[in-house]
């Protein structure tokens, strides 16, 4: 069998392949491999968005252990994007910084960023060299602690695996696996949370480094433009403007004839896609847009800013939201009724068919039973006739004195 294409691969397989490319890119930089890894991780991001695995209303405790690893996708994509060789280095740096900021912002929403990092970001960064040095030392300590913890979890898992294998070989009795599975689940969650913490430490350092590199390159480019070594001609600008206008016209023309696909509303469909039992089409898009029951619904307008969206989500229903509309429920019941009527019509046709109207043939033993009944009736009639001819006591009349 041939290999599955990137669109047909399930999300766990895509993430595993992308993480392997990310790990191998740390030692050797092959541009084809790096670009392939970026493409795979972008496909992961697109599938995560369509499946709606994460919500801004959740924290790290609300995310399942199986989905924790997908938080690292923007971080892996940022590191691979930074390694892409391109003539426009500033464009690569901006793309990598955007993914790093997206990763840090989402981790902050999930309450995964340390308090000291949040305080530093709210204050606009450390001003003095002493503050910057203290921040780097604290970050380095967290990074070393996370690396040591990951190594400890790995060694503990290997030891437990060896002991379990030895116990299975020495004892023929099957051991209980519930405790082992619980330990594995707790260790897996702890390992992914530690990996995310390690990724945050590296992401902050990489973001600072990329900002400095962008500042240097921007200064060099500005100096080159001022010196006249490299200028954009008016023809190039006109050509780019023409391309943009053409693209917008084509997009507007497609929008009139393109019907957007219905969003994925079934909660189990996302899990089916994750485990590879179903495929998600390119047209589907699933976003967390819950029904609004808060202030925005009272004033009769849709929320536009993030503040209005959060305020609109204050008053939420205490009951479970419906999974289908009234029209869909009516169609389902109508289909059930049609099937029931078709089944009844079929049964009535079978009941009125000639096979049921024909008189059933007598069985082989019924003729013998009828003959036995006639013989018994003849015998009973003969006995009655004899009793009429010979009344009771008629044979003893000669023995009586008056006889």
Curated annotation (Swiss-Prot):
Any coiled-coil regions, as ranges: none
Q: Where is the composition biased (Acidic residues)?
A: 174-184, 366-375
Q: List the disulfide bonds.
A: none
Q: What happens when the gene is disrupted?
A: RNAi plants show severe growth retardation, the formation of spontaneous disease-like nectrotic lesions leading to premature cell death. The defective plants also display a strong reduction in protein synthesis, and chromatin bridge formation at anaphase.
* Origin superkingdom: Eukaryota
GO cellular component labels: cytosol
Give me the segments passing through the membrane.
Answer: none
Similarity-based family: Belongs to the IGBP1/TAP42 family.
- Annotated protein name in UniProt: PP2A regulatory subunit TAP46
Species this chain originates from = Nicotiana tabacum (Common tobacco)
């Amino acid at each position: 069998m041939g290999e599955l294409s990137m669109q047909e691969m399930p999300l766990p397989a895509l993430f595993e392949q992308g993480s392997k490319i990310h790990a191998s890119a740390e030692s050797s930089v092959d541009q084809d491999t790096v670009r392939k890894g970026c493409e795979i991780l972008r496909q992961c991001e697109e599938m995560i968005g369509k499946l709606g695995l994460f919500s801004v209303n959740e924290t790290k405790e609300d995310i399942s252990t199986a989905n924790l690893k997908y938080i690292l996708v923007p971080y892996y994509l940022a590191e691979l994007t930074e390694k892409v060789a391109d003539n426009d280095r500033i464009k690569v740096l901006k793309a990598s910084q955007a993914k790093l900021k997206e990763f840090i912002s989402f981790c902050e929403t999930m309450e995964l960023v340390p308090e000291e990092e949040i305080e530093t970001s709210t204050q606009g960064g450390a001003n003095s060299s002493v503050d910057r040095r203290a921040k780097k030392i604290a970050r380095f300590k967290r990074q070393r602690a996370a690396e040591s913890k990951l190594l400890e979890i790995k060694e503990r898992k290997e030891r437990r695996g060896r002991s379990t294998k030895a116990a299975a070989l020495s004892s023929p009795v099957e051991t209980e696996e519930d405790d082992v599975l619980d330990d594995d689940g707790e260790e897996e969650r702890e390992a992914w949370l530690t990996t995310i913490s390690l990724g945050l430490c590296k992401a902050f350092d990489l973001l600072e480094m990329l900002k400095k590199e962008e500042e240097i390159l921007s200064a060099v480019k500005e100096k080159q433009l001022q010196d006249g070594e490299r200028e954009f001609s008016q023809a190039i600008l006109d050509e780019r403007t023409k391309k943009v206008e053409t693209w917008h016209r084509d997009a507007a023309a497609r929008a009139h004839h393109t019907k957007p696909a219905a969003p994925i509303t079934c909660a189990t469909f996302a899990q089916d896609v994750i485990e590879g039992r179903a495929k998600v089409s390119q047209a589907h898009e699933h976003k967390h847009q819950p029904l609004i029951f808060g202030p925005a619904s009272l004033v009769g307008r849709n929320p536009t800013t993030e503040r209005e969206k959060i305020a609109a989500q204050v008053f939420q229903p205490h009951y479970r939201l419906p999974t289908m509309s009234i029209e869909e429920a009516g169609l389902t019941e109508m289909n059930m009724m049609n099937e029931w009527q078709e089944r009844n019509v079929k049964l009535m046709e079978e009941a009125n068919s000639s096979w049921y109207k024909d008189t059933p043939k007598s069985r082989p033993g019924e003729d013998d039973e009828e003959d036995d009944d006639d013989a018994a009736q003849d015998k009973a009639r003969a006995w009655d006739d004899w009793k009429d001819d010979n009344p009771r006591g008629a044979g003893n009349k000669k023995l009586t004195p008056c006889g």
